């Protein structure tokens, strides 16, 4: 071995020594070694020092239980007491983080106190006071709601409100479209817009921030396309963006203009998890984006589609990057599922009445409403009618139990739909509410792979083979030669040298190493993962175990993924009707509406 290579290996070993020491501590505590690697990724090379100073920082990592952090603390600091103030303070943040997993940015003092008592914190009030003093937690006392919030989310919601007011105050009128000579219908003008759609266009051109909402088939896309055209006629530059790659691609096709993911628009870049002194850096919600207050977006008008998917931190980063005078048009269906991350930005903007909102309700798609559009509109309004679809645009397939549900799904995708309707399996997407069980994503993907793309033994690498359909579960815009975004569905084209090449539609992405953990098989995906995308044909499977998870927004989101054909494999009994009739989705507690004033 040459001296140069030996020197590099020695340097690499010395640099990795803190990670080895941390892994040893994890094993001593009875925790998996991989948790040490995750800690180093999250906290940086000083992770061991940080965690020895405060072992309960470990709770900042997703999936870490209180018992895990306690075990690590005993290994890191022999003789440490359960009454340690660092533990009590960390548990306040942990309680609020657990609430954030359910979408809440605000939690009652009573709930946090209950969580602390459950984990044997003797003085919850003092623990809360300590967490607030450390500026990790904020106490919120508002007109709409009161409670505790993680500082990062409170600051994000406050920043959204400030930016909305800033854009509202600095906007100048781009232009205005007027009604042309009415056609005989006395409803639609020569641009193809009805009066309500036209008012949405004028809102976008007149106001700094405006909202357009409505269900499928109501003309949101036509309205947005008109906004883009009118802005460009006025000599203004336009940016089109959406939370997912598929949604951005569809927006580009509808508007005949370039569109991209919000992350790509903002210029995503690696995020530093901690500062040099070990204090958390996550309070800067726009960290990781090149665009921001110092280098704002150049466009005069920014249009964001599928805005129900915006969580508070992404929305805050987007609004922060909008320069004074920018017009921001926010488009989305308020009846869809809220964001995976905390908050309900679209719903709060609508409820606040701080910005002009237009809701489209008239059905235009498919000659005033095909079976898919009619069903979606009914569900949006809380009704579940009998399906009337002689052309088999919507088909209900009853099933008894999860195993039969799974069998029906495989049969529909591999045989019935291609044979009866001429829609190839490559255009069909399975959507399910669950991961586990016979009708969950894991089992369905295994069954569909066995039928559609059984592994060739000489080309396999890990789980993936050429021809596999896959879905991205995280953003990796740094991938080469083409990056990809969370939610993008692609096809594996090559497997070689422990690297999987995937075509996501915008170009090939070479995926290897730790990045592979963020790729899953994609013949069957969850409702949340499907949000923001549309497919030629969709099979929605509703197994019995999904009953308690169903809500009107979840059902509505699932049904509206289909463009040409929708098959519903129904095994959930009366739970579906119950979910549709009762909104069923527990309201998220947020403070944005109050900040908007």
Placement of each model-derived feature along the sequence:
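Accessory, non-ATPase domains that flank or precede helicase/AAA+ motor cores in DNA-metabolism machines
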Residues: 1-176, 180-181, 205
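Short loop/turn elements that form and flank the Walker-type P-loop nucleotide-binding site
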Residues: 65, 205-207, 234, 296-298, ...
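Conserved helicase motor core of P-loop NTPases
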Residues: 182, 186, 199, 334-485, ...
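C-terminal accessory regions
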Residues: 474, 488-597
């Amino acid at each position: 071995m040459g001296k140069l290579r030996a020197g590099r290996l020695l340097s690499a070993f010395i640099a990795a020594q803190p990670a080895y020491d941390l892994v040893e501590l994890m094993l001593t505590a009875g925790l998996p070694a991989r948790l040490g690697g995750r800690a180093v990724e999250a906290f940086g090379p000083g992770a061991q020092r940080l965690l020895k100073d405060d072992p309960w920082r470990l709770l900042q990592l997703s999936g870490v239980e209180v018992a895990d952090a306690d075990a690590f603390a005993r290994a890191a600091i022999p003789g440490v007491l359960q009454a340690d103030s660092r533990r009590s303070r960390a548990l306040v943040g942990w309680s609020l983080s657990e609430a954030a997993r359910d979408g809440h940015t605000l939690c009652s003092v009573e709930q946090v106190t209950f969580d602390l008592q459950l984990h044997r914190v003797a003085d919850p009030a003092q623990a809360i006071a300590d967490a607030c003093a450390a500026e990790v937690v904020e106490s919120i006392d508002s007109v709409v709601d009161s409670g505790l919030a993680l500082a990062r989310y409170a600051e994000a919601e406050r920043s959204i409100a400030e930016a909305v007011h800033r854009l509202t105050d600095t906007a100048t009128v781009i232009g205005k479209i007027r009604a042309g000579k009415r056609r005989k219908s006395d409803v639609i003008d020569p641009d193809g817009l009805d009066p309500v759609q036209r008012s949405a266009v004028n809102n976008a051109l007149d106001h700094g921030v405006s909202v357009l909402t409505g269900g499928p088939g109501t003309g949101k896309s036509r309205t947005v396309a008109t906004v883009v055209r009118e802005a460009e006629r006025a000599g203004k530059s336009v940016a089109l963006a959406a939370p997912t790659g598929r949604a951005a691609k569809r927006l580009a096709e509808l508007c005949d203009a370039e569109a991209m993911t919000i992350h790509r628009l903002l210029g995503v870049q690696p995020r530093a998890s901690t500062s040099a002194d070990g204090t958390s850096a996550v309070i800067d919600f726009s960290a990781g984006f090149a665009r921001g207050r110092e280098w704002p977006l150049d466009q005069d008008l920014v249009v964001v589609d599928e805005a129900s998917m915006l969580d508070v931190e992404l929305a805050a980063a987007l609004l922060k990057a909008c320069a004074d005078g920018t017009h921001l048009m926010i488009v989305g269906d308020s009846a869809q599922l809220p964001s995976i991350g905390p908050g309900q930005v679209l719903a709060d903007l609508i409820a606040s009445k701080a910005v002009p909102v237009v809701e489209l309700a008239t059905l235009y798609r498919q000659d005033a409403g095909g079976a898919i559009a009619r069903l979606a509109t009914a569900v949006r309004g809380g009704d579940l009618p009998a399906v009337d679809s002689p052309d088999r645009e919507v088909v209900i397939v009853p099933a008894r139990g999860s195993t039969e549900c799974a069998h029906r799904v495989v049969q529909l995708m591999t045989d019935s739909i291609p044979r009866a309707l001429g829609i190839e399996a490559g255009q069909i997407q399975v959507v399910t509410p669950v991961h586990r069980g016979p009708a969950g994503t894991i089992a369905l993907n295994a069954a569909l792979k066995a039928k559609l793309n059984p592994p060739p033994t000489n080309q396999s690498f890990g789980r993936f083979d050429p021809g596999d359909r896959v879905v991205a579960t995280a953003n990796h815009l740094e991938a080469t030669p083409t990056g990809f975004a969370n939610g993008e569905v692609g096809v594996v084209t090559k497997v070689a040298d422990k690297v999987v090449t995937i075509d996501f539609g915008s170009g090939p992405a070479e995926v290897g190493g730790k990045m592979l953990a963020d790729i899953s098989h994609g013949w069957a995906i969850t409702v949340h993962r499907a949000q923001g995308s549309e497919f030629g044909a969709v099979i929605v499977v509703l197994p019995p175990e999904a009953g308690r998870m169903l809500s009107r927004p979840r059902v509505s989101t699932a049904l509206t993924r289909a463009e040409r054909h929708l098959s519903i494999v129904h095994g959930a009994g009366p739970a579906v009707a119950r979910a549709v009739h009762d909104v069923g989705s527990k309201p998220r507690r947020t403070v944005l509406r109050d900040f908007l004033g």
